[in-house]
């Protein structure tokens, strides 16, 4: 073995003899590999392994090294430098690397990482077909947070092969991490070469001139796969057809199957031409990814005669938007925009009688009239009560208002009820 580098302590020999069932051990003797495969790719196989020091299962990745790289001391040095760089990454949404070494005899790069009990996002979505958009938003936030960290490095680290197969999840607590940092790309030693998975490649990546925003495009394709459970461009016949559609800037057929306008808009922002494409930081601030439990309030500057309180405001919770005006002491005119069962947005204007109506009774009536899901009822009721609490301080809400976030000239305030 040459270029051996493993962050592992030397282990004493087992008192009871050799471990049974393992295939090989790392140079330091800390990790042992079993023959059980947990994942594989064109040049890589991932096995289940065991950390004898910590007593936990880990993943052992073996990637084949091209002969042209093995025969070049310069390229091998560059490969080893890249591995060392990846080992310095420390982030909650980046896969942890525990040890690594190059086996010159077997012509492989060996990397020990944490093991994800639920596999990749691709495997997880195939197993669990019914996933709420709220959960997928949490996954998206974690992926973007990891990308934001990578892209903030000096110089920026570009994944180049981001896809759901390279994003891993522990299903028991929903933690998502980015892994598999395209070592095959560095093994080829062509930084600007066309390497990766074609279906997830940004058009500019095909030209060889790109920046970290290629990862955002790939993230958009990941979102598309998460939402539709369809692999991008699965409608195409062969790689040449896929290449042509990407080169022409045509989106996968799966994109046009998305009924939710807000989801489509978010994905479209990720797939935009590079000059218009948002960064990870910008996407994390998008309204689409904001906490649905928050009620965002925009206060209109018009003031009542005493100058103390606004007579109009706009509230938003998830995809629901409510605005209105207090006309007289006992009467309020409200306007609500909401997603209907078909995925389109509908708007309705209605009066609210302060002496006869309650937020809950109105919400129940709307759910029945427009065929909305039962989840819509508490959202509508909370928006109405929050609106009235802001404009009529003495109003007593009939549902719990978890959190109201008001944005105005005086900055941000948070009021919990």
UniProtKB/Swiss-Prot annotation:
**According to the UniProt record, what class of enzyme is this?**
transferase
EC nos: 2.7.11.1
**One record GO biological process:** intracellular signal transduction
Ranges where the record places region Disordered: 1-23
The Protein kinase domain sits at 32-289
Which catalytic residues are annotated?
Answer: 180 (proton acceptor)
Reaction(s) catalysed by this chain, per the record, are:
L-seryl-[protein] + ATP = O-phospho-L-seryl-[protein] + ADP + H(+); L-threonyl-[protein] + ATP = O-phospho-L-threonyl-[protein] + ADP + H(+)
Q: Is the keyword Cell inner membrane in the record?
A: no
Q: Does the keyword ATP-binding apply?
A: yes
Keywords for this protein: ATP-binding, Kinase, Nucleotide-binding, Serine/threonine-protein kinase, Transferase
Transmembrane domains' residue ranges = none
- The entry's ATP-binding residues are 113-116, 163
Pfam family membership, one? Pkinase
What would you give as a GO molecular function for this chain, any one? Answer: protein serine/threonine kinase activity
Which Gene Ontology cellular component annotation is one that this UniProt entry carries? Answer: cytoplasm
Q: Enumerate the PANTHER family for this protein.
A: SERINE/THREONINE-PROTEIN KINASE WNK WITH NO LYSINE -RELATED (PTHR13902)
UniProt record similarity statement? Belongs to the protein kinase superfamily. Ser/Thr protein kinase family. WNK subfamily.
Q: What is this protein called?
A: Probable serine/threonine-protein kinase WNK9
Please report the organism this UniProt entry assigns to the protein.
Answer: Oryza sativa subsp. japonica (Rice)
């Amino acid at each position: 073995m040459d270029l051996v580098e493993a962050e592992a302590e030397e282990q004493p020999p087992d008192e009871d003899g050799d471990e049974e069932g393992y295939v090989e051990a790392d140079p330091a003797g800390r990790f042992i590999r079993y023959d059980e495969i947990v994942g594989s790719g064109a040049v890589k196989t991932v096995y289940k392994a065991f950390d004898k020091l910590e007593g936990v299962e880990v993943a052992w990745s073996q990637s084949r090294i091209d002969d042209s790289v093995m025969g070049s001391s310069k390229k091998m040095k560059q490969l080893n430098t890249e591995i060392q760089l990846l080992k310095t990454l420390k982030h909650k949404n980046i896969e942890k690397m525990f040890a690594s070494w190059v086996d010159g005899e077997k012509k492989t790069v060996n990397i020990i990482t944490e093991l994800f009990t639920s596999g990749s996002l691709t495997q997880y979505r195939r197993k669990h077909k019914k996933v709420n958009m709220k959960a997928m938003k949490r996954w998206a936030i974690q992926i973007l947070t990891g990308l934001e960290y990578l892209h903030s490095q000096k110089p920026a680290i570009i994944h180049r092969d981001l896809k759901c197969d390279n994003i891993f999840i522990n299903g028991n607590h929903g933690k998502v991490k980015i892994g598999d940092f395209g070592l095959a790309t560095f093994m080829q030693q062509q930084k600007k070469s066309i390497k990766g998975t074609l279906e997830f490649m940004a058009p500019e990546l095909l030209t060889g001139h790109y920046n970290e925003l290629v990862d955002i495009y790939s993230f958009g394709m990941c979102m598309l796969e998460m939402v539709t459970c369809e692999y991008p461009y699965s409608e195409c016949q062969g790689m040449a057809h896929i290449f042509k559609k990407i080169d022409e800037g045509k989106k996968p057929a799966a994109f046009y199957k998305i009924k939710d306008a807000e989801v489509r808009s978010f994905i479209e922002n990720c797939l935009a031409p590079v000059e218009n494409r948002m960064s990870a930081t910008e996407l994390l601030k998008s309204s689409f990814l904001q906490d649905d439990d928050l009620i965002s309030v925009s206060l209109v500057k018009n003031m009542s005669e005493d100058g103390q309180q606004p007579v109009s405001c706009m509230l938003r919770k998830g995809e629901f938007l409510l605005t209105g005006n207090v006309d007289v002491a006992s009467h309020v005119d409200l306007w609500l925009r909401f997603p209907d069962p078909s995925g389109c947005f509908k708007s309705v204007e209605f009066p609210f009688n302060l002496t006869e109506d309650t937020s809950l009774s109105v919400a129940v009536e709307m759910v029945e009239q427009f065929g909305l899901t039962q989840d819509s009822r508490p959202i509508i009721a909370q928006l109405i009560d929050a609106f009235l609490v802001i404009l009529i301080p003495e109003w007593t809400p009939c549902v719990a208002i978890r959190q109201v976030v008001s944005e105005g000239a005086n900055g941000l305030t948070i009021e919990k009820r």
